[in-house]
Design a protein with these regions (language model features):
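N-terminal Rossmann-like NAD(P)+-binding subdomain of aldehyde/semialdehyde dehydrogenases
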Residues: 2, 6-101
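Rossmann-like NAD(P) dinucleotide-binding subdomain of oxidoreductase/dehydrogenase enzymes
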Residues: 93-170
Length: 170
């Protein structure tokens, strides 16, 4: 059933992450670029879904959800390379002459469960950070925003293999 499907997706994503495909920064930036293109291509569909689910007008849909996602996308496209670099920190005297740094490594598979009230923003914005961080993601949009959930599923299916980003509805 549904539980087995989720377990299979989780196992496939763990294997995808272990393969290392999501680690290179150029791959992460490509994912973000693909997502931006898809959001722009489906902007009217997203607005219609938000109208259907929550009664949001086009202006509110753009200002409170789509525009904020696009703004965050632009920010991450400009900054992801910098965020992925090692950060040098002070080395304790006892460890001299070693050099110390913090390495920013991806963690694996991220589950993002979002609420109904800002269903596009609060599903896609955490996805952006997870992808920029080099992780695989399972998205669980709110069942109380079915039209928005469906367009999120469609956009993600166009942009990513299920092993990288999967949407679980219901």
């Amino acid at each position: 059933g549904s539980e087995m499907c989720i377990r299979d997706r989780f196992a496939a994503q763990k294997a995808c992450f272990a393969s290392g495909i999501t680690r290179p920064v150029p791959h992460r930036l490509d994912q973000l670029c693909r997502l931006r293109r898809a959001i722009l291509a489906h902007e009217q569909d997203i607005e219609a879904a938000l109208q259907s689910d929550l009664g949001k007008c086009r202006t509110e849909a753009y200002m409170c959800e789509i525009g904020m996602v696009l703004s965050e996308l632009g920010y991450l496209l400009r900054r992801t390379r910098r965020y992925c670099r090692d950060t040098h920190v002070l080395t304790p005297l006892a460890q001299f002459p070693a050099r110390s740094f913090i390495r920013h490594d991806p963690m694996g598979v991220v589950l993002i469960m979002s609420p109904w009230n800002y269903p596009f923003l609060l599903t896609i914005e955490p996805l952006l950070g997870a992808l920029a961080g080099g992780n695989c993601c399972i998205l669980k949009p709110s069942k109380d925003a079915p039209a928005t959930s469906a367009i999120i599923r469609q956009i993600c299916a166009e942009c990513f293999p299920l092993e990288e980003v999967a949407v679980v509805e219901g």
